[in-house]
Design a protein with these regions (language model features):
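Active-site loop/oxyanion-hole signature of alpha/beta-hydrolase fold enzymes
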Residues: 51-92, 267
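Gly/Ala-rich beta-loop-alpha elbow adjacent to hydrolase catalytic centers
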Residues: 93, 97, 101
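Conserved alpha/beta-hydrolase catalytic His-Asp/Glu region
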Residues: 152-208
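Flexible "cap/lid" loop of the alpha/beta hydrolase fold
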Residues: 106, 113-148
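Catalytic active-site module of serine/aspartate enzymes centered on a nucleophile-bearing elbow/loop
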Residues: 244-276
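Acidic catalytic loop of the alpha/beta-hydrolase fold
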Residues: 223-229
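Short beta-strand/loop motif that positions the catalytic acidic residue
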Residues: 212, 218-220
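Conserved HGGG/HGGXW glycine-rich cap/lid loop of the alpha/beta-hydrolase fold
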Residues: 6-62
Length: 276
């Protein structure tokens, strides 16, 4: 699959699947595009031109070490849109990918067809309690230092309900293990992972949410405990602040609902795309 040298200073790796109205999938912190296979690329590519990327510094997207910001990642993506001539485009942003999607919609109005904020947030201002501070959570840094990056990611996926509910992990251990292997294969290294964590927590767009002037779907699992359980209240608070947005709570799934219940997720997304 191709790479493109961008003026923003990154050799960006991307993949395309299917034909139709374009959709870009933006994954969570530190992950390469591999996590979108087979779900939901397989389902969405039946009717859409699906684009996935390794963001700068992750997987096969090469660039020099540098300070990272959400608006910088968004600029990379917009230049990719220019090269591929794919606008207007549906943006699906999972976790940190939702922050990138918000930045795309705010800074490049008219280029985004619709925005799906999947288990995401707009910044620390929508987080409850002590997590409202604009810095990485103390517990995250402690776990990362104590366990190391690989064990930190493995533990979140295989042991906690951070990505999958206890019920799903017990019933589908093979699916969970395969997701872990896929997620780790081209995962960010320690320096780049920390850059993304810092960029995620430095980002704040909560005060700008009322200025979003496009269709916005907010998806969150009822059992999403990732990030200390902040995604569920953050999703509700974003829905209150984004005019005309639609909030969909997916019962019985956690942060990784794309992979925990791919059929239900694809059905919701296809219904949204048909309407927008």
């Amino acid at each position: 699959m191709p790479k493109v040298a961008l003026k923003t200073g990154v050799e960006l790796y991307y993949e395309e699947h299917g034909k139709g109205v374009p959709v870009i999938l933006l994954q969570g912190t530190g992950f390469a595009l591999d996590v979108w296979q087979p779900h939901p690329v397989r389902e969405l590519s039946a009717n859409h031109r699906v684009i996935t990327i390794d963001p700068r510094g992750i997987g096969r997207s090469l660039c020099e070490d540098a300070v990272l910001s959400i608006d910088q990642i968004a600029a990379d993506i917009v230049e990719l849109f220019d090269r591929l001539s794919v606008e207007p485009i549906h943006v699906i942003g999972h976790s940190i990918g939702g922050r990138i999607g918000i930045e795309l919609a705010l800074n490049y109005p008219g280029r985004i067809r619709s925005l799906v904020l999947a288990a995401s947030g707009s910044g620390s201002a929508v987080r409850p309690g002590e997590d409202a501070f604009p810095m990485p959570q103390h517990r995250l840094l402690v776990r990362l230092i104590e366990r190391g990056l690989e064990e930190h990611v493995r533990y979140e996926i295989l042991v906690t309900e951070g990505y999958f509910t206890d019920k799903f992990r017990a019933a589908q251990p093979g699916v969970v293990d395969e997701f872990w292997k896929t997620a780790w294969k081209n995962h960010a290294n320690v320096p780049w992972y920390l850059r993304y964590v810092m960029a995620r927590h430095a980002y704040e767009a909560t005060h700008r949410l009322p200025f979003l002037k496009l269709p916005v779907l907010i998806l969150v699992g009822s059992s999403d405990h990732a990030g200390g359980g902040a995604h569920f209240p953050a999703s509700k608070m974003m829905a209150d602040r984004i005019p005309g947005s639609e909030l969909k709570i997916m019962e019985g799934v956690s942060h990784g609902f794309f992979w925990e219940n791919p059929e239900m997720t694809a059905k919701i997304l296809e219904s949204w795309f048909r309407a927008h």
